[in-house]
């Protein structure tokens, strides 16, 4: 959608799932798999990141299943993985990942991931949590942006509107310039959860989703 994108690697372990999406969810992907800028690979995401140290990605997005015991994403929420991500990013790169529920009954995954990324101050000086309403989950869902140089809280509605216009983005149904700051305003219960339940996740002690 953004005309500034020159190349995009999509790393997805489940080839069968992608084939299903291509056929049955065109209203979501809008034939993006046919875009010449897109490169789809079916490999383990962690190994891909580890093998691409120095690749200078401007952005890495981790849209993953939860860290379930025995699941494929268990070690994609740990400090070691985040360090590999930092090494694969450019000097002003940005990392974004979905981080679990952002509701009052189960804020634990988000709190732990936020604390873990926050511990990597040398790699990611800016760590900002935000949330959105995901209709398929029927609850607010959390995301975290970790950046080497750019603080999303410094973006004004005017600057966001200008950038979207320059990039030819006109069809957003959720994210808008006026909504930007609201997304990054976490509820008070989430701020308390980060303080009370935040912990550093490692390969030896990963987060195990129990909800």
Give each language-model segment a name.
Residues 1-94, 104-117:
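The AdoMet/dcAdoMet-binding core of the Class I SAM-like
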Residues 82-83, 108-134, 144:
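Conserved Class I S-adenosyl-L-methionine
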Residues 102-103, 134:
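Conserved beta-strand edge residues that scaffold enzyme active sites
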Residues 126-211:
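Soluble small-group transferase modules, centered on the S-adenosyl donor enzyme superfamily
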